[in-house]
Structures are given as structure tokens and as C-alpha cells.
């Protein structure tokens, strides 16, 4: 019987990758589990997508090590493979912020994460579609969104979540509301918004938290969160209290829905982030979901 094959994609510039030694431990665990391991290190942005798409069909499992951006690239590559030929995917978090890993309790220790992935049953997860691109856990715009792709990598590596907060707070006085018409499963929201997210995660940029009871990763639905521009002191107070108390579901200052399909219409391109990766936006964007589109070893 042929050995199973595992492609190990490593981003050596990821925030917490101080040494590759722990990754050798993870590779040994995969080998002990019966996999022939092939390692590829990325050298430029987008290479994880290229590797996953071109080599993925030859492997049973594709593992990536890096931050959420590396995971996003890898999943985009895998999702370009016809569904019947898609390999399983696994993730060893090593970035400065790892929201997806936090949501699914994936250990930051490569050996522990690898051992868990080899021990537990694979799990099917929903995958988002933002225009022609995929996202794993969040598509967002507005406040703090620009921060995720403008903070220099070296600063992210040192300060992690705090780097995002510092840069976001620095820009609070220049926040510009976005005029948008958002249609979510037939319900229309037409107004000005400071922030918006379509997510499948309990953690967004390490700053906003949803309870595990609110989020299901395989139900064919996303969580839509919109922060309208507060027009009155009472609305501002409601917004501040909701953010402080992390009560996004029951606040009059926020819009929260479980949705399957979203259309966003604007008069201008609005920059967005997909799992922390920059997207230039477009005047009309269709956001959908492929239910159980990805099978992951967690």
C-alpha cells in the first residue's frame, strides 16, 4: 500500500517563526503517522496559493504554517482544485495574530497542533466567497481594516494584536464613514457605516469577540456585523457600551445577522481585507458561502 503524501507549506517570515526546529518536530509527527512529507518554503506573497493549487491534487493533505494570511493563500489555492480532488488542509499557526486558530483552539505549538490533527477526525468547514476570491473566516471594511495590511511585518511580529490597536487608534480621528447599500438574504441596509464584517469566527483581529454559542463553522451561514455612524449621543453611548461589553447581538447601536448571501453596493471602491489580506474592493461585490467546502484536520 502506498504511503499517504503530505505537502508542508512554510512561511518563514511569519510573526512567531523564530526557529524552524519546532517545525521539524511537526514533520516527524506527520511521518510517524504514515505520511511522506514534502516541505516547501514560500519566498513571496501569493506563493502559498500557487503551491497549493499546482501541487495539491498530488497530495492527501496540505499543511500550512504561518499567519492567517498564509492560511488564506493556501485555502485559495486548494479551493481552485475541483472538489472531488481537493486534499485535506491543516494549519500550524505562526503569525502575529491567529484569529482562526483562536476560534478553533488550535495550539500555537507546532508539535501539539500536528499531534491533534493526526489524532482527531477531519472536520468540514464553510468557506466564504468574496467576488472571485475565497476567505476562511472574515471579510471586513472600515475601522481597523486598513491596519491589518499597513502595519509593517516587523512591527506585527513584535507587538501582535497591540500593533493593530496602536495603528487603529492613531487613525480614529480620520475615520471616514462609508456609504453602502447592503442586501443580506433579502434584507436591505442602506446607510453610512464605520465598520462591517462578514465572519465565520469567534475572533476578529483579536479585538472583537463573538461567543462560541453564536458561531457555527459548518452551518452554511456567516455572521454579519455592521457599525452604523451614530447620529445622536444616545446612539453613540449604545455603540460604546456594545463594544465595551462585547454585546454585538443585542445592541441598538449595531446590526447583527446570521446570513448566507450578501451584496454590497457602493459609489466607489472600498478597500477590504480577507483574513487580513488586502482586497481593493469594487462598486458591487457578491459575498457567498460554500457550505462544507473545506475539510480540515484540526
Per-range role (PLM):
Residues 33, 42, 81-198:
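Catalytic core of DAGKc-family lipid kinases
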Amino acid at each position: 500500500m502506498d504511503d499517504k503524501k503530505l505537502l508542508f507549506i512554510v512561511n518563514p517570515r511569519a510573526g512567531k517563526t523564530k526557529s524552524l526546529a519546532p517545525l521539524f518536530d511537526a514533520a516527524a509527527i506527520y511521518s510517524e503517522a504514515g505520511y511522506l512529507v514534502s516541505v516547501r518554503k514560500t519566498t513571496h506573497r501569493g506563493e502559498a496559493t500557487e503551491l497549493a493549487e499546482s501541487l495539491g491534487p498530488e497530495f492527501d493533505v496540505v499543511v500550512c504554517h504561518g499567519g492567517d494570511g498564509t492560511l488564506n493563500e493556501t485555502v485559495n489555492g486548494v479551493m481552485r482544485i475541483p472538489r472531488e480532488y481537493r486534499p485535506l488542509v491543516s494549519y500550524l499557526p505562526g503569525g502575529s495574530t491567529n484569529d482562526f486558530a483562536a476560534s478553533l483552539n488550535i495550539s500555537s505549538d507546532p508539535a501539539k497542533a500536528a499531534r491533534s490533527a493526526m489524532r482527531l477526525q477531519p472536520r468540514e468547514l464553510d468557506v466564504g466567497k468574496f467576488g472571485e476570491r475565497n476567505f476562511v473566516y472574515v471579510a471586513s471594511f472600515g475601522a481597523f481594516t486598513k491596519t491589518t495590511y499597513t502595519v509593517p511585518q516587523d512591527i506585527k511580529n513584535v507587538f501582535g494584536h497591540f500593533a493593530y490597536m496602536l495603528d487603529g487608534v492613531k487613525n480614529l480621528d480620520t475615520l471616514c464613514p462609508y456609504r453602502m447599500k447592503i442586501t443580506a438574504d433579502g434584507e436591505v441596509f442602506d446607510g453610512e457605516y464605520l465598520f462591517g464584517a462578514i465572519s465565520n469566527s469567534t475572533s476578529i483581529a483579536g479585538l472583537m469577540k463573538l461567543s462560541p454559542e453564536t458561531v457555527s463553522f459548518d452551518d452554511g451561514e456567516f455572521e454579519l456585523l455592521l457599525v452604523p455612524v451614530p447620529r445622536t449621543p444616545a446612539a453613540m453611548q449604545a455603540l460604546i457600551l456594545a463594544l465595551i461589553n462585547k454585546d454585538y447581538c443585542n445592541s441598538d447601536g449595531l446590526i447583527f445577522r446570521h446570513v448566507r448571501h450578501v451584496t454590497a453596493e457602493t459609489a466607489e471602491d472600498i478597500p477590504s481585507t480577507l483574513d487580513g489580506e488586502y482586497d481593493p474592493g469594487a462598486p458591487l461585490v457578491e459575498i457567498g458561502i460554500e457550505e462544507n467546502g473545506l475539510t480540515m484536520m484540526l
